[in-house]
Amino acid sequence: MQRGALSPVLMLSAAPEPPPRPPPALSPPGPGSAPRHGSARSGPAPEPSGGLAAALDSSLRAAVAFKAEGQRCYREKKFREAIGKYHRALLQLKAAQGARPGGLPTPSPGPTTSPGPARLSEEQRRLVENTEVECYDSLTACLLQSELVNYERVREYCLKVLEKQQGNFKATYRAGIAFYHLGDYARALRYLQEARSREPTDTNVLRYIQLTQLKMNRCSLQREDSDGGTGGPARNVVG
């Protein structure tokens, strides 16, 4: 009968066969089966984290490398090639910031997911931000060297830089230039005066402030003339 004492083990092995009614002997297999499912779930967990870390590191290295190539092209006055390199660096930065569990579209449903880019250390966040700012700043410099300057893009990139670094002199000055050429003289003057407060003796800033003030004066005179012109004929007709 000592062998009969082993019957619960036999019952355990035989218990999974009849699914209709689980006898009391099925309670041991429950915890026994749970580890199997748990191990299947927990087994692959280290693999995605390692894969994400490798992808993140690779994206950051690629972004820094593309930025360096863009700087080299800019020094060689290959502005179009430099623009392409900076754009590729920004794409790599977006890929790095998108390396989060579950992907970018669904960060909110999971309460355990962090609000910022997942798996980015503080040093990596600083690297991403600094590289992004340098790329946008360099893009504006390249665009301003073009024969046909896209001032809307210059304005867009300058504002992106100022979102991260409000005290960036070059971005402030170039934003003023962009608004000037887009005909928004009030905003142009605001950014240019802000740039002058940081670099009071910069001749380019002072020159653009004078140009902007001249444009604003002309616009105000034209409005006065147009108002007077419409009022003049009306009085003549009445007379």
Swiss-Prot record:
<dbReference type="InterPro" id="IPR039663">
    <property type="entry name" value="AIP/AIPL1/TTC9"/>
</dbReference>
<keyword id="KW-0802">TPR repeat</keyword>
<keyword id="KW-0677">Repeat</keyword>
<feature type="compositionally biased region" description="Pro residues">
    <location>
        <begin position="104"/>
        <end position="114"/>
    </location>
</feature>
<feature type="region of interest" description="Disordered">
    <location>
        <begin position="98"/>
        <end position="121"/>
    </location>
</feature>
<feature type="modified residue" description="Phosphoserine">
    <location>
        <position position="27"/>
    </location>
</feature>
<protein>
    <recommendedName>
        <fullName>Tetratricopeptide repeat protein 9B</fullName>
    </recommendedName>
</protein>
<dbReference type="InterPro" id="IPR019734">
    <property type="entry name" value="TPR_rpt"/>
</dbReference>
<feature type="repeat" description="TPR 2">
    <location>
        <begin position="169"/>
        <end position="202"/>
    </location>
</feature>
<dbReference type="InterPro" id="IPR013105">
    <property type="entry name" value="TPR_2"/>
</dbReference>
<feature type="modified residue" description="Phosphoserine">
    <location>
        <position position="7"/>
    </location>
</feature>
<feature type="repeat" description="TPR 1">
    <location>
        <begin position="63"/>
        <end position="97"/>
    </location>
</feature>
<comment type="similarity">
    <text>Belongs to the TTC9 family.</text>
</comment>
<feature type="region of interest" description="Disordered">
    <location>
        <begin position="1"/>
        <end position="54"/>
    </location>
</feature>
<dbReference type="InterPro" id="IPR011990">
    <property type="entry name" value="TPR-like_helical_dom_sf"/>
</dbReference>
<keyword id="KW-0597">Phosphoprotein</keyword>
<feature type="compositionally biased region" description="Pro residues">
    <location>
        <begin position="16"/>
        <end position="32"/>
    </location>
</feature>
<dbReference type="Pfam" id="PF07719">
    <property type="entry name" value="TPR_2"/>
</dbReference>
